[in-house]
Regions:
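Polyanion-binding surface elements
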Residues: 1-16
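Short helix-start
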Residues: 4-6, 27-51
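DNA major-groove recognition helix of helix-turn-helix
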Residues: 23
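Conserved two-metal-ion catalytic palm core of "right-hand" nucleic acid polymerases
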Residues: 52-224, 235-249
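Conserved polymerase palm-domain catalytic core
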Residues: 172-278, 282-301, 305-308, 313-317, ...
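Short, low-order "capping/linker" segments at domain edges
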Residues: 323-337
Length: 560
């Protein structure tokens, strides 16, 4: 009996592109008729098939595993710092897990806060701050079909590949996968090149069509009772456009891979030497004409899905053997750093200097250097970083990590005060404000009065997002001004916003001013804060909002 390539793919749990490559290599029995492969079903290897029965059991939704995985990835690397790094919910997770479990059935979403993340000197991208309950539900729902997606993904795709040890995280290390992507394509261009096209997609996560995405999930045989709440969550977060998925969560990375599967399979099926890491794509050929043909074909395929290639980021060129790349300099500096060699400081400083030469900084290089120079407590670049804070806004978390080592020094405090007071329109980005406030909370002794006044103004502006007001409230509390403390108490007791109440409870605890009647009143109105109250009662000190474990932060600097 003969069957089609899609049917063989379903039976073997592999992608259609993989089936075609196995047919071409003689590893699966079949023949090509009229330019299309047919598969000899009776000669297929006996591998477990993917169940297509209408009555198949619903995949198990594991919200507890989702929280464990999120603590290792998403929650540790949020766009802006949380006042407790969500440790209160991790310590007493029962209520938040129950709420997340309910969302996995209803799809009812909480309000999403958009953080404008600087991208270049003038533009931004929309980072999504989901509630913890929403984030857990989103992750748990998507995790139910992660294995199906993994089986269908081509081995030419390196982004967001499933981790064999699910307790350690949903995906393999993004850093390791990015390095493999670079190493593999660099080897490939030396043997199958020398021409390579490099391109990426414009605002990829923000342009994903929900309609097309759910068509792909249907083809992947995701059950309707998983798709329905997932669809409702995405609608709730993006109700205005029905396009876009949250930037940041691992769940979105999984959906991002699924959305590109059809493009991957078509490019590979047509014989193009194609490689992908999420929205970064490379095509290799032995002539300029051939690589441009492939690029044009990719452009057409992406356009049919509502995606656009970035013209400024599309590069076509010859890559001769032995040519050094930016990644080579990063790898060498990282080798010096990890092995404690004297050359480390000089090499990493050089990377930082080169990242700041142009008006638009090399963000990845700046982030790489700042984290490592912070680990080395390298004072030599301090003055340069303070002078360039306005240009380092894209690397705000890493800048804060570096500055925290010197945050109690009077000279540095004066420089930060001047910077906060200095910019005219449009002023300091909220994203950078949040990370600077987190660094200011690391100060030993009393913060400068100017910082308290600055933070107080932020708390009093109801138009500011709650995450920013909460961070500012914690700095205000350290000033122990009676008027400010009275406002914190009143907010904790009377405010209707549980996020703001949580922030003020933490602020009062930070100042040693949290009293039981205030806690009782807050929890009676916002029962979900019971875990916060228990956490604060059991702690003699609060966690650093920057120091996630310096070595792990060094390990996790993103390559995208």
């Amino acid at each position: 009996m003969n069957i089609s390539v899609p049917e063989a793919a379903l039976r073997l749990g592999k992608s259609q592109a993989t089936i075609r490559r196995l047919l071409a290599g003689g590893q699966i029995a079949g023949q090509k008729v009229g330019g299309r492969w047919i598969v000899h079903a009776e000669k297929l290897p006996h591998l477990p098939s993917v169940s297509t029965a209408a009555g198949a059991d619903r995949p198990r939704i594991d919200v507890r595993l989702a929280l464990r995985q999120l603590r290792r990835t998403d929650i540790r690397d949020l766009w802006v710092p949380d006042v407790l790094k969500w440790e209160d919910y991790a310590q007493e997770p029962s209520e938040v897990l129950a709420a997340a479990q309910a969302k996995c059935s209803t799809g009812q979403s909480d309000e999403v806060i958009v953080v404008n993340i600087p991208k270049g000197p003038h533009l931004s991208r929309a980072g999504s701050l989901l509630s913890l309950e929403d984030r857990i539900a989103y992750h748990a729902l998507c995790a139910t079909f992660a294995e199906k997606a993994e089986r269908r993904l081509s081995d030419r795709v390196y982004s967001s590949r499933l981790n064999a040890n699910q307790r350690a995280g949903l995906f393999k290390s993004g850093i390791d996968q990015w390095k493999k992507f670079n190493e593999t394509t660099n080897r490939e261009v030396r043997t199958a090149g020398p021409w390579m096209a490099k391109t990426d997609l414009v605002s990829y996560f923000e342009t994903i069509s929900h309609k097309v995405l759910f068509e792909e999930l249907t083809l992947l045989q995701v059950p309707e009772d998983i798709k329905r709440p997932l669809r409702e969550l995405l609608r709730g977060w993006r109700f205005e456009t029905q396009h876009g998925i949250p930037i940041g969560p691992d769940a979105s990375r999984l959906l991002g891979n699924i959305f590109m599967m059809r493009v991957d399979e078509t490019m590979l099926d047509e014989g193009w030497n194609y490689w992908r890491y999420m929205d970064d794509i490379r095509i290799i050929a032995n002539s300029e004409r051939e690589v441009v043909r492939a690029l044009r074909r990719l452009e057409v395929l992406c356009r049919t899905r509502g995606l656009l290639l970035s013209s400024p980021k599309t590069k076509v060129g010859e890559y001769p053997m032995g040519e050094a790349t930016d990644d080579d300099s990063l790898d060498l500096a990282d080798y010096f750093f990890r092995n404690g060699l004297d050359e480390a400081r000089k090499a990493i400083r050089k990377i930082l200097h080169s990242s700041l030469l142009d008006k638009s900084i090399k963000t990845r290089h700046a982030r790489f250097a700042l984290v490592r120079l912070g680990a080395l407590v390298d004072r030599a670049v301090l003055a340069k970083i303070l002078r360039r804070l306005d240009r380092l806004k894209e690397a705000s978390p890493e800048s804060a990590l570096y500055l925290r080592s010197f945050i109690s020094e009077t000279a540095l405090q004066q420089e930060i005060t001047a910077y906060l007071a200095g910019p005219g329109e449009p002023g300091v980005e909220e994203y950078q404000q949040a990370w600077l406030l987190a660094a200011m909370l690391e100060v030993l002794g009393d913060p400068p009065r100017e910082w308290i006044i600055y933070a107080w103004r932020i708390t009093q502006d109801a138009n500011n997002p709650s995450y920013l007001r909460n961070l500012a409230a914690n700095l205000v509390a350290l000033g122990k001004d009676p008027e400010h403390l009275a406002w914190l108490r009143k907010t904790a007791i009377e405010n209707y916003n549980p996020a703001l109440v949580r922030g003020t409870l933490v602020a009062l605890a930070r100042a040693g001013e949290l009293r039981q009647p205030i806690v009782d009143s807050a929890v009676s109105r916002h029962t979900q804060l019971r875990c916060t109250a228990e956490y604060l009662r059991s702690r003699a000190s609060l966690p650093s909002l920057i120091q996630v474990g310096l070595w792990s932060r060094v390990r996790e600097v993103s390559n995208t």
